[in-house]
C-alpha cells in the first residue's frame, strides 16, 4: 500500500525539508508509522493517506530541525534536469537559460510560506486532486484552492520579470 506512492512521498518530503538526506529520513520514519498503523487504519484513498503521514512526519521533523539554509546546487535532481535540458536543447544558450529558469522556479517554490509550498508541491508536482490535498492536510477544499491561488500569484510575482 505504501510502495506505489513512495516516489510521491519522497518528492513531497524533499520539498518540505529542502534536501535529499532529510527527505530520506522523513520518508523512512513515515513508512515506519504507516506500517505500524496499517492494521488499524481504514484507508479509502491510499495515496492521500501515505502523503498525509509524510506531511505530518515532515512537519514534526521541521519543528525539531529547522534547516538553516537550502543549497539547491547540490541537488542531484536539479543537476540531472539541467543535464537533460543541455542534452535536448539545440544550443548551449538555450540549455543555460532552461537550467537557470528551473533553478529560479525551485528557489521561488522553496521561498514560499510552508502552507503555500505544500499545496503547490502536492498539486502541481505530485498531481494530487484538490480533494486528496484537502484530506492530506486536514483543510477544506476551498482552503486548498485559495492557498494554491495565492501561492501561484506569489510565484508569478517572483518570477514575472523572467518571462
Identify the function of each model-found stretch:
Residues 1-11, 21-24:
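A short, charge-rich alpha-helical start-of-domain segment used by transcription regulators
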Residues 29-46, 64-66:
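Sigma70-family region 2
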Residues 78-110:
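Acidic, proline/glycine-rich intrinsically disordered inter-domain spacer in sigma factors
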Residues 55-74, 90, 98:
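Arg/Lys-rich amphipathic alpha helix in sigma70-family domain 2
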Residues 107-118, 122-143:
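Helix-turn-helix DNA-binding module
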Residues 6, 10, 31, 113, ...:
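C-terminal flanking helix
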Amino acid at each position: 500500500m505504501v510502495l506505489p506512492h513512495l516516489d510521491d512521498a519522497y518528492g513531497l518530503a524533499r520539498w518540505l525539508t529542502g534536501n535529499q538526506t532529510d527527505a530520506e529520513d522523513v520518508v523512512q520514519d513515515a513508512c515506519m508509522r504507516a506500517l505500524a498503523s496499517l492494521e488499524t487504519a481504514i484507508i479509502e484513498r491510499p495515496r492521500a493517506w501515505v502523503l498525509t503521514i509524510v506531511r505530518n512526519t515532515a512537519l514534526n521533523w521541521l519543528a525539531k530541525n529547522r534547516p538553516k539554509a537550502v543549497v539547491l546546487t547540490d541537488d542531484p535532481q536539479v543537476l540531472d534536469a539541467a543535464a537533460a535540458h543541455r542534452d535536448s536543447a539545440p544550443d548551449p544558450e538555450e540549455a543555460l537559460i532552461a537550467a537557470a529558469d528551473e533553478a529560479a522556479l525551485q528557489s521561488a517554490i522553496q521561498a514560499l510560506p510552508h502552507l503555500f509550498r505544500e499545496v503547490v508541491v502536492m498539486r502541481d508536482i505530485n498531481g494530487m486532486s484538490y480533494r486528496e490535498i484537502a484530506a492530506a492536510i486536514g483543510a477544506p477544499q476551498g482552503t486548498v484552492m485559495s492557498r494554491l491561488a495565492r501561492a501561484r500569484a506569489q510565484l508569478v510575482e517572483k518570477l514575472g520579470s523572467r518571462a
